[in-house]
Curated annotation (Swiss-Prot):
Keywords: ATP-binding, Cell shape, Cell wall biogenesis/degradation, Cytoplasm, Ligase, Magnesium, Manganese, Metal-binding, Nucleotide-binding, Peptidoglycan synthesis. Pathway: Cell wall biogenesis; peptidoglycan biosynthesis. PROSITE patterns: ATP_GRASP, DALA_DALA_LIGASE_1, DALA_DALA_LIGASE_2. It comes from Agrobacterium fabrum (strain C58 / ATCC 33970) (Agrobacterium tumefaciens (strain C58)). ATP binds at residues 128-183. NCBIfam families: D_ala_D_alaTIGR, PRK01372.1. Its EC number is 6.3.2.4. This is D-alanine--D-alanine ligase.
Length: 308
């Protein structure tokens, strides 16, 4: 497997730069351990010129957030004819737009929460939905900008119309789903397993719960019935296929089992660029399934292509 020259794309200039640096450096170290020649490329606005001069055999995309997972870098790599990992242009752009991704998922028969897309400046003193509900930037990851509006809040939060809001004007408002945080990775069209994410000291799986030390506990395999476990794996594969993902993806779910074991399973979103440190969710699932981190990233390099 080794011998190829791999450019690991990391860093970038989105709000998820710190996450990308962690993912990229972890992947670079693992690939070096597998015998690949690795060049770390901290992505800037001149990335096309840098890659055109470097001409690697493969670009390992360890970017997160806008530019890295919205089809932009994928389009640059297609233009340069450099094979790359993860999903292609269309799937990346579609998955990054939460509202459009939900429409595609719903059309494929995947259960989603009711929602509406609106301009944040259209928020008035009246709630757009009956609380509780969740407000999400349409095109952000890592739970940046997510606001939960609770039952006892009489007005929408003021931050949404503040000049300090950095996440764009389009937001998605969806009903709040009570329940447990479950997530399922998909590799090469097959489910890797289901993990329950238990936030520690947080109301939901926000940025700090995801990335701060001790912010959450990962339970794998999730302590749910075999029926629900299989259902979530099936839905994750369906989402992977419906969106058109390639390589690896991760779908997030809410499972409300307060009233019955069957409960309600709701698909939240698919992540085409999931975190890639050894302790991130997808590598943990792969390890539980018997695939080492080095083997996982090597597989991704060998799977790389253009026209994904």
């Amino acid at each position: 497997m080794g011998g190829k020259h791999v450019a690991v794309l990391l860093g970038g200039f989105s709000s998820e730069r710190p996450v990308s640096l962690s993912s990229g450096n972890a992947c670079a170290l693992a690939l070096e351990g597998e015998g690949y020649k690795v060049t770390r490329v901290d992505v800037g606005r001149d990335v096309a010129a840098v890659l055109d001069e470097l001409r690697p055999d493969v670009a390992f995309n360890a970017l997160h957030g806008p530019f890295g997972e919205d089809g932009t870098i994928q389009g640059i790599l297609e233009y340069l004819a450099i094979p790359y990992t993860h999903s292609g242009v269309l799937a990346s752009a579609l998955a990054m737009d939460k509202a459009q991704a939900k429409k595609v998922a719903a059309a494929a028969g995947i259960p989603v929460a009711g929602e509406r897309v609106m301009n944040r400046f259209d928020f008035t003193s009246e709630h757009p939905l009956q609380p509780p509900y969740v407000v999400k930037p349409v095109r952000e990851g890592s739970s940046f900008g997510v606001v939960i509006v609770k039952e006892d809040q009489s007005h929408p939060p003021q931050i949404l119309t503040s000049s300090e809001w950095p996440f764009g004007n389009q937001v998605m408002v969806e009903r709040y789903i009570h329940g447990r945080e479950l997530t399922c990775g998909v590799l090469d069209g097959e489910a890797l397993g289901v993990t329950e994410v238990v936030p520690l000291g947080h109301n939901f799986y926000d940025y700090d719960a995801k990335y701060a030390a001790g912010g959450s506990k990962h339970v794998i395999p999730a302590g749910i019935s075999p029926k629900i476990y299989q259902k979530i794996q099936t839905l994750a594969v369906m989402a992977h296929q419906a969106i058109g993902c390639r390589g690896v993806s991760r779908s997030d779910f809410r499972y409300d089992d307060r009233f019955s074991e069957d409960g309600e399973v709701i698909w939240l979103e698919v992540n085409t660029q999931p975190g890639m440190t050894p302790t991130s969710l997808v590598p943990e699932m792969a390890a539980h399934a018997g695939r080492s981190f080095g083997d996982l990233v090597s597989w991704m390099v060998e799977d790389a292509s253009c026209l994904r």
